[in-house]
């Protein structure tokens, strides 16, 4: 966090972030030239899949293909791909660990290039998907749509980096947060419309309790950690380790192994994997299985099979992705270099083994909590017989809670820095 002479730095940062978010939100509704949006809206009202495609990026029920329609999603996808490449390619992994600031700049540049490539892919998909909806569609119009949407995505990336650097909060996270929040009025309206006069008060109270438990569980999942205490060779407790993010003058240094190291990635990967069979079937490649999947037994047990698979895949992806985020071997090597060890555990192989065992237990607990929380929207839907609750998934709640917690921490940091500045001014 940069120290600033301006005592109103918190307000300035907040206004900058809000201004950029408002500008991006307005740009989402700035129509791309060449598209007859009146005809497009008429077509979309009758084709649910196209409505879903167009409204996915904007975060609500808009039917406008705007300059910032792609929003920050190309960058999010590029970041995920980059994380996987760093974990799979030894050269990139070594560059990230040993390259310092210059390496971070190189990886950021590669991520931006991936963002550009992914923007081209997504904008091309949108352009060709609109072919059936636009009478005036041609290759020139498709090219213009691709250029507009790709340019818009890169502008959004640039503005999000300005928020991260000079504003309040993390730019990409705030943009996703804004998209989710913008869809909440429609979600509330849908729930009220579907439930009016149909749902008993007891079901509402039970669902409210389940939602409260879900929010509490998400906060616990986001903030919960297992502290692995450390001891330095010189027995000094005045400063914390660079990677610990915290220190305790009574108990010494510690490594915070969080319950949910992988964030929402296990849910994203699980959803992507479970969509693949349906996608392949719709292409006509698995038509031979039609007699099997139309059996009454399969139809009745389909939801059970789906959610058991959902639960198991989240467990597996959580265990896998957590090893990418925190590698016990790398952590052990760093401790050895800094002449720091875990009390009662020998440095080297024994420390690596100990960290692996602790991480397995912590990650398994976090994965079980994440999988249980992921099924809660469906529990509420079953109680109320409403389809609207599936639109407010665990991923959205995790992002909402995570962004709020991050903003709270950053605001506290700015306030404390200003207090210290006043003390020594």
From Swiss-Prot:
Top-level division of the source organism's lineage: Eukaryota
Alphabetical UniProt keywords: Chloroplast, Membrane, Plastid, Protein transport, Thylakoid, Translocation, Transmembrane, Transmembrane helix, Transport
Membrane-topology descriptor: Multi-pass membrane protein
Subcellular localization: Plastid, Chloroplast thylakoid membrane
Predominant cellular place of this UniProt entry's protein: plastid
A single cellular component GO annotation: chloroplast thylakoid membrane
Residues passing through the membrane, by range: 15-35, 62-82, 113-131, 139-159, 168-188, 201-221, 266-286, 304-324, 364-384, 385-405
Stored SUPFAM superfamilies: Preprotein translocase SecY subunit
Gene Ontology biological-process entries: intracellular protein transmembrane transport; protein targeting
InterPro entries linked: SecY, SecY/SEC61-alpha, SecY_CS, SecY_dom_sf
Pfam families: SecY
PANTHER family: SECY/SEC61-ALPHA FAMILY MEMBER
Similarity annotation: Belongs to the SecY/SEC61-alpha family.
Summary of subunit composition and partner proteins: Component of the plastid Sec protein translocase complex, which is composed of at least SecY, SecE and SecG.
Alphabetical list of HAMAP family matching this protein: SecY
Alphabetical list of NCBIfam families matching this protein: 3a0501s007
Function: The central subunit of the protein translocation channel SecYE. Consists of two halves formed by TMs 1-5 and 6-10. These two domains form a lateral gate at the front which open onto the bilayer between TMs 2 and 7, and are clamped together by SecE at the back. The channel is closed by both a pore ring composed of hydrophobic SecY resides and a short helix (helix 2A) on the extracellular side of the membrane which forms a plug.
Name this protein carries in UniProt: Protein translocase subunit SecY
Organism: Trieres chinensis
């Amino acid at each position: 966090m940069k120290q600033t002479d301006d005592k109103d730095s918190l307000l300035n940062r907040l206004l900058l972030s809000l201004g950029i978010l408002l500008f991006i939100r307005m740009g989402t509704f700035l129509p791309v030239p060449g598209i007859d949006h009146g005809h497009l809206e008429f077509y979309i009202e009758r084709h649910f899949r196209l409505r879903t495609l167009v409204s996915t990026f904007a975060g609500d029920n808009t039917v406008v293909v705007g300059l910032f329609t792609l929003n920050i999603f190309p960058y999010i996808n590029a970041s995920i791909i980059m994380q996987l490449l760093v974990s799979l390619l030894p050269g990139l992994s070594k560059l990230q660990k040993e390259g310092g600031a210059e390496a971070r700049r190189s990886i950021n540049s590669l991520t931006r290039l991936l963002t550009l490539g992914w923007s081209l892919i997504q904008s091309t998909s949108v352009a060709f998907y609109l072919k059936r909806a636009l009478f005036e569609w041609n290759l020139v119009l498709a090219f213009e749509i691709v250029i507009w949407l790709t340019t818009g995505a890169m502008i959004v990336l640039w503005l999000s980096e300005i928020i991260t650097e000079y504003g309040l909060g993390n730019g990409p996270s705030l943009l996703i947060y804004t998209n989710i929040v913008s869809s909440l009025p429609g979600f509330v309206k849908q729930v009220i419309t579907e439930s009016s006069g149909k749902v008993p008060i007891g079901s509402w109270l039970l669902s409210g309790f389940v939602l409260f438990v879900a929010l509490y569980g998400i906060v616990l999942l986001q903030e919960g950690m297992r502290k692995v205490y450390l001891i330095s060779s010189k027995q000094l407790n005045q400063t914390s380790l660079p990677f610990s993010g915290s220190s305790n003058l009574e108990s010494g240094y510690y490594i915070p192994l969080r319950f949910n190291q992988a964030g929402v990635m296990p849910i994203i990967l699980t959803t992507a994997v479970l969509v693949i069979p349906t996608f392949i079937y719709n292409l006509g490649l698995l038509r031979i299985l039609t007699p099997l999947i139309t059996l009454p037994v399969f139809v009745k047990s389909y939801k059970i099979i789906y959610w058991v698979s959902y639960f198991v895949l989240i467990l597996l992806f959580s265990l896998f992705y957590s090893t990418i985020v925190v590698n016990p071997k790398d952590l052990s090597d760093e401790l050895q270099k800094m002449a720091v060890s875990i009390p009662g555990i020998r440095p080297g192989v024994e420390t690596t083994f100990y960290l692996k065992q602790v991480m397995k237990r912590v990650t398994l607990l976090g994965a079980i909590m994440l999988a249980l929380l992921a099924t809660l929207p469906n529990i509420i839907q079953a109680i109320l017989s409403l389809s609207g609750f599936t639109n407010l998934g665990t991923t959205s709640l995790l992002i909402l809670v995570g962004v709020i917690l991050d903003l709270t921490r950053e605001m506290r940091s700015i306030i404390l820095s200003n207090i210290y500045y006043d003390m020594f001014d």
